[in-house]
């Protein structure tokens, strides 16, 4: 059972989505929930159906005291690596909140630097901390929508299906069609495709 840090009124949860994909930004969200307006059914976004995620995302946006998205683009990921880019995007999400939290709970085992707010990393936080679950849902919905937009631009890559993850289909398309400007050049399968073309 997770124990919340004592003596802090406004607690934000932060999570990222999109460390593994070969394309696009890593997207993060920060959420401060309203203790007087609870949301039923919050869970790790990966364990929810798309329909449930979308419904919960709307409810979170409506009921949360504050929420914000952050991101780090593919070229930033290539420049500073995916871990540093994820942490940078988390800081951006927290700094974009319209209400600044007193404490931040971060999914995983690392705390972003430059937060300037007391923080704690929570391993598997997206499953055990409501604020982090809410953040994971908002980040996942936002990133999936971006992949659906990219799919409209480049339907031959089937981004709506694999969401940019290195599935067999995506790797086949990469080998056949080459990399797009949105692909992460520092990731091995993309590097390989760039060498072939």
From Swiss-Prot:
Gene3D superfamilies per UniProt: Ribonuclease H-like superfamily/Ribonuclease H
Location of the RNase H type-2 domain: 9-197
Catalytic activity: Endonucleolytic cleavage to 5'-phosphomonoester
GO cellular component annotations of the record: cytoplasm; ribonuclease H2 complex
Subcellular location: Cytoplasm
Cofactor note: Manganese or magnesium. Binds 1 divalent metal ion per monomer in the absence of substrate. May bind a second metal ion after substrate binding.
Protein role: Endonuclease that specifically degrades the RNA of RNA-DNA hybrids.
Similarity-based family: Belongs to the RNase HII family.
Protein name: Ribonuclease HII
